[in-house]
């Protein structure tokens, strides 16, 4: 980054333009033979009234020495900058070693609050593979914002209200055969599926379910007790899965939490003349914005998701005074969030500009979609178990003497599943396939974790090294420079991931370091008889280890030291 700034400043001195603007115009050539940075001179063609090749040649002749830059070359319409490899590698690793585990962090956030809503499971429903994208993306963003100096607030907006709980009570009272605390969520799901099967032939069961939910709303002791038991059981079970994933939340305030907060929102909407009634339903007309109406109350007076989301957004702003409020929810809810944000705006809440729907593609099974009603679900717990079991077998085959095999298998197996969700742009749909998720070759989580373990192994074998004794003259080869370049690019990737709310940018940057390190490892003997060369290459290995470990952490993976 320093070389980029210095190069931009040198161009600014010759053109009179702002260095910050010029810095943004500098590109990274696709071929390293074309330089480390390239300035596209067509950007200046109009103002300078010259052809880009002429501008490039003129700048190359007029710019003098730049610290950290070995040479410049005018090539076509580009001015290419070639970094001093030795100085660049030395400066990069010194920076990483000085910052240690905080490499990639910044104080950008200044302690300001960022709300991140993710996972948002439904009570007494399966925690299935379809919940993984929201959980993994949200957890990664939570960690990324923390690393950038924000006070991230993780929110699990529980689906813990609605007529489905009336259905659950009816099913439990008809077919349940033991106290709720002794049940499993899977048993409750079977009851729920059975309710829907039976209700198709006996629709009056739906009336019975509505009556039981009304009892919950009215505070009936038996109904509320059952509802709370369903909730406690679910949170206890999913808590174990969250622990395996390394996921945490600061708030579990869900739909039920906002029941007593919606009245004030509805009153405000009415006072501001935003409500109209159509066919018995109370709504906000959004036809002027090319959107369907946002329904606030159904004809029977029941609230909807939008009503609760409005109450939740206003509560979060008052409680946390956030600078950003992120909703990590599937793209199928795009319209809902457009409507909901527009209503917030019409209410006069200018802070709605700080709210963002962080959408993502859907997860489907190779053989079909996921549905709780018909029991066609793949539990996330089963996916993690299968991944850990397969990893354990691989370890047993390749490293039977590895200490703490079970812990390593758990870290790598779970990591493989999480990484598969975070290695591509979040908007892409994912077809869940055992073969893909449990493939341990290529650009996978296990490959990144193995590279970290390889770094640790080299450093263990070497013992203590003296960074002050390093001989920087060995930093001139391409493999070494490529590794330093990948490491140096990492902090910018963390910033970009937050700017775009795209964790995959960190995953890709981490993989770049892994790939570059393995090339460096095979091209260079790290521990040699020359103490200065050994110290230099060990220092670079340590810098790679630090960067990979941080990258793995930011996307929710552990970094085993032995594999």
Where are these regions (language model features)?
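Non-catalytic interaction-recognition regions
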Residues: 1-90, 98-563
């Amino acid at each position: 980054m320093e070389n980029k700034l210095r190069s931009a400043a040198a161009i600014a001195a010759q053109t009179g333009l702002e260095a910050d603007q010029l810095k943004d115009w500098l590109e990274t050539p696709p071929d390293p033979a074309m330089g480390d940075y390239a300035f596209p001179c067509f950007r200046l063609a109009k103002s300078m009234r010259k052809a880009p090749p002429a501008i490039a040649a003129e700048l190359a002749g007029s710019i003098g020495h730049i610290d950290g830059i070995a040479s410049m070359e005018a090539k076509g319409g580009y001015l290419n900058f070639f970094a001093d490899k030795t100085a660049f590698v030395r400066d990069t690793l010194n920076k990483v070693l000085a910052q240690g585990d905080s490499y990639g962090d910044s104080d950008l956030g200044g302690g300001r609050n960022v709300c991140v809503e993710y996972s948002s499971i439904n009570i007494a429903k399966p925690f299935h593979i379809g919940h993984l994208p929201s959980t993994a993306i949200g957890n990664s963003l939570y960690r990324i914002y923390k690393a950038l100096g924000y006070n991230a607030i993780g929110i699990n907006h529980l689906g813990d209200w609605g007529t489905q709980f009336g259905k659950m009570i009816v099913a439990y009272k008809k077919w349940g055969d033991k106290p709720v605390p002794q049940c499993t969520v899977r048993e409750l799901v079977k009851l729920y599926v059975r309710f829907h099967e039976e209700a198709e032939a006996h629709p009056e069961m739906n009336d019975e379910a509505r009556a039981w939910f009304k009892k919950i709303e009215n505070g009936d002791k038996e109904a509320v007790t059952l509802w709370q038991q369903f909730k406690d059981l679910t949170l206890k079970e999913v808590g174990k899965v969250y622990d395996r994933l390394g996921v945490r939340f600061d708030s579990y305030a869900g739909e039920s939490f906002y029941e007593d907060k919606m009245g004030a929102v509805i009153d405000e909407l009415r006072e501001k003349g935003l409500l109209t009634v159509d066919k018995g339903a109370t709504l906000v007309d959004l036809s002027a914005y090319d959107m369907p109406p946002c329904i606030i109350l159904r004809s029977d007076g029941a609230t909807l998701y939008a009503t609760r989301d409005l109450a939740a957004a206003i509560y979060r702003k008052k409680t946390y005074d956030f600078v950003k409020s992120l909703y990590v929810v599937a793209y199928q809810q795009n319209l809902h969030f457009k409507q909901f944000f527009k209503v917030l705006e019409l209410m006069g809440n200018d802070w709605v500009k700080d709210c963002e729907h962080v959408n993502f593609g859907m997860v489907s099974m190779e053989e079909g979609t996921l549905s709780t009603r018909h029991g066609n679900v793949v539990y996330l717990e089963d996916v993690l178990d299968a991944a850990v079991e397969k990893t354990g077998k691989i370890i047993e085959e390749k490293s039977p003497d590895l200490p703490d095999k079970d812990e390593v298998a758990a870290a790598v197996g779970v990591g493989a599943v999480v990484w598969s969700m975070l290695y591509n742009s979040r908007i892409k749909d994912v077809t869940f396939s055992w073969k893909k998720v449990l493939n341990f070759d290529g650009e996978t989580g296990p490959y990144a974790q193995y590279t970290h373990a390889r770094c640790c192994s080299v450093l263990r074998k070497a013992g203590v090294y003296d960074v002050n004794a390093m001989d920087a003259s060995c930093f001139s080869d391409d493999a070494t420079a490529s590794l330093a370049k990948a490491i140096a690019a990492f902090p910018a990737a963390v910033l970009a991931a937050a700017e775009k709310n795209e964790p995959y940018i960190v995953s890709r940057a981490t993989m770049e370091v892994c790939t570059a390190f393995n090339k460096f490892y095979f091209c260079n003997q790290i521990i040699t008889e020359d103490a200065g060369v050994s110290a230099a290459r060990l220092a670079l290995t340590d810098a790679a280890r630090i960067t990979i470990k941080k990258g793995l952490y930011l996307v929710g993976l552990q970094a085993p030291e032995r594999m």
